């Protein structure tokens, strides 16, 4: 397991051996070039980004000891400024070591495979010679079969070539990281060059999405949000969380009309997605605020203090980013992925943690920038459903399928408007949280009727207008 430190974190440096690999996609005949790279660690220099996404259990854990009560706005502002100043001082530029003496060249095991049989054979060989842990090799082989079956079921042309190309690069990235594990700093910026991990993740998930049966709700509001971001405002998206593919799904559905949002989201990532060997390459392609989840904080008692210090640093990063303005934050106030009802098997948005939601609201209020909170719904569990139960061990089984997906947003919900008439802060917190959850749940049901109920855009309601912006 990788452990995040509260000291100055390492950063990815790139050197040597640029190798291109062409990718086919289900929606275009164009290909994307990826470079095989050699990684080496060094001290990081300060970098910036614009958009953030997080899960509430992690946010609450970070914020509980840092946020004041709503009646202590003066001390809140002081604490806020102090935290931001601390981050600025800690992240001063540090000279980095030259890479001229690094002569290590990595073998690209999978880049030249020509068939599924050859790829599986290479996985087995790597395991036999000890370069690949047996558990990872087993997971790789299983993932390949699930992915291949899902893409083949889509009926897209050149499906076998797409599968082989995407899986070859993905498995090379996995092997590369096993040889020299990448350690995520508290704030990780997506790796876009010379190897474009973001585009790799998009191209990998793209063939799993049935765009003919996928929808965006209220595309005009996404346009409105981009305008607010350009004005320096902060935006919060209170959302449900369906699968590990959520980031790619959001970006795929918005990439044509809202590339600002699609390409620059930052996600708060627990230790699961930054330590699981099969998940790390996808995480490396996203902007992440790395924290330890409350659910797994006490898995190893000896690491509790280290994890808490890492979370404190991540909170400081969040404070500084918000203070800079023009940030959009995706947060899942349920604290984790949605799960089906144990009796009916029906999926629905997980219940929101109102305290975590309120922590985020107050962070935004004290940022010194205008802030707007929107309810957002996601439906995409079919393409990569989570395990039925929350698992303690790293390395969950990943089942995949080709299916329609959806994302929808409704107009912002103002705290002061909704809480008007409430007798106290606790009642206001509950009323506001419930209003956001109800909106997410209603939008989810519209997406469900359109995608699962096969009603298409006919499932639109007066408050949720469905469209397919990529088709226009």
Curated annotation (Swiss-Prot):
User: By which gene is this protein encoded?
Assistant: GAT
Gene Ontology MF: a single term: glycerol-3-phosphate O-acyltransferase activity
Name the Enzyme Commission number(s) assigned to this protein. Answer: 2.3.1.15
Q: Which BP terms in the Gene Ontology apply to this protein? A: CDP-diacylglycerol biosynthetic process; phosphatidylglycerol biosynthetic process
Example GO CC term: the record gives: chloroplast stroma
The record's comment on protein family reads:
Belongs to the GPAT/DAPAT family.
**Role description:** Esterifies acyl-group from acyl-ACP to the sn-1 position of glycerol-3-phosphate. The enzyme from chilling-resistant plants discriminates against non-fluid palmitic acid and selects oleic acid whereas the enzyme from sensitive plants accepts both fatty acids. This is an oleate-selective acyltransferase.
Which SUPFAM superfamilies does this one have? Glycerol-3-phosphate (1)-acyltransferase
What does the UniProt entry say about where the protein is found?
A: Plastid, Chloroplast stroma
> Motif range for HXXXXD motif?
241-246
Q: Which reaction does it catalyse?
A: sn-glycerol 3-phosphate + an acyl-CoA = a 1-acyl-sn-glycero-3-phosphate + CoA
Q: What is known of its domains?
A: The HXXXXD motif is essential for acyltransferase activity and may constitute the binding site for the phosphate moiety of the glycerol-3-phosphate.
Q: Which InterPro entries does the record match to this protein?
A: G3P_O-acylTrfase_chlp, G3P_O-acylTrfase_N, GPAT_N_sf, Plipid/glycerol_acylTrfase
Designated name of the protein: Glycerol-3-phosphate acyltransferase, chloroplastic
- Give each disulfide bond as a residue pair: none
Q: Where is the transit peptide?
A: 1-102
PANTHER family, alphabetized? GLYCEROL-3-PHOSPHATE ACYLTRANSFERASE, CHLOROPLASTIC
- Recall the taxonomic lineage recorded for the source organism: Eukaryota, Viridiplantae, Streptophyta, Embryophyta, Tracheophyta
Main localisation, per the record?
Answer: plastid
Question: In what pathway does it function?
Answer: Phospholipid metabolism; CDP-diacylglycerol biosynthesis; CDP-diacylglycerol from sn-glycerol 3-phosphate: step 1/3
Q: Pfam families, alphabetically?
A: Acyltransferase, GPAT_N
**Lineage top rank: taxon:** Eukaryota
Keyword terms, alphabetized:
Acyltransferase, Chloroplast, Lipid biosynthesis, Lipid metabolism, Phospholipid biosynthesis, Phospholipid metabolism, Plastid, Transferase, Transit peptide
């Amino acid at each position: 397991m990788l452990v995040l430190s509260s000291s100055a974190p390492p950063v990815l440096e790139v050197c040597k051996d640029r190798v291109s690999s062409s990718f086919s996609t289900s929606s275009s005949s164009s290909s994307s070039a990826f470079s095989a790279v050699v990684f080496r660690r060094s001290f990081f220099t300060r970098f910036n980004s614009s958009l953030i996404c997080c899960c509430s259990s992690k946010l609450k854990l970070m914020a509980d000891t840092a946020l004041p009560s709503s009646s202590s706005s003066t001390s809140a502002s002081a604490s806020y400024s102090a935290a931001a100043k601390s981050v600025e001082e800690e992240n001063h530029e540090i000279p980095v070591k030259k890479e001229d003496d690094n002569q290590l060249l990595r073998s690209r095991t999978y880049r030249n495979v020509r068939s599924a049989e050859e790829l599986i054979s290479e996985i087995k060989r790597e395991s036999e010679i000890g370069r690949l842990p047996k558990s990872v090799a087993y997971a790789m082989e299983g993932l390949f079969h699930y992915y291949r079956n899902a893409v083949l079921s889509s009926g897209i042309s050149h499906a076998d070539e797409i599968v082989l190309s995407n899986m070859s690069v993905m498995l090379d990235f996995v092997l590369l990281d096993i040889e020299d594990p990448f350690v995520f700093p508290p704030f990780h910026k997506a790796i876009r060059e010379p190897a474009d991990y973001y585009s790799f993740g998009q191209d990998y998930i793209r063939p799993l999405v049935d765009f003919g049966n996928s929808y965006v709700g209220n595309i005009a509001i996404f346009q409105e949000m981009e305008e607010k971001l350009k004005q320096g405002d902060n935006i919060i998206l209170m959302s449900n969380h369906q699968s590990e593919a959520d980031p790619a799904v959001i970006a795929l559905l918005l990439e044509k009309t809202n590339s600002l949002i699609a390409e620059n989201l930052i996600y708060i990532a627990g230790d699961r997605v930054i330590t699981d060997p099969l998940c790390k390459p996808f995480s490396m392609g996203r902007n992440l605020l790395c924290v330890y989840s409350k659910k797994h904080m006490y898995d190893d008692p000896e690491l509790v203090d280290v994890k808490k210090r890492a979370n404190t640093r991540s909170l400081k990063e969040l404070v500084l980013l918000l203070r800079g303005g023009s940030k959009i934050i995706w947060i899942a106030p349920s604290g984790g992925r949605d799960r089906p009802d144990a009796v009916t098997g029906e999926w629905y948005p997980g219940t929101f943690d109102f305290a975590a939601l309120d922590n985020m609201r107050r962070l935004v209020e004290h940022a010194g920038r205008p802030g707007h909170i929107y309810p957002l719904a996601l439906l995409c569990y079919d393409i990569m459903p989570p395990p039925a139960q929350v698992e303690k061990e790293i390395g969950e089984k990943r089942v995949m399928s080709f299916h329609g997906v959806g994302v929808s947003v409704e107009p912002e919900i103002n705290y002061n408007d909704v809480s008007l008439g409430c007798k106290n802060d606790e009642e206001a917190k509950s009323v506001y949280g419930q209003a956001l959850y109800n909106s997410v749940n209603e939008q989810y049901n519209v997406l469900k009727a359109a995608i699962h109920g096969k009603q298409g855009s006919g499932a639109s309601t007066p408050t949720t207008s469905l469209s397919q912006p990529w088709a226009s």
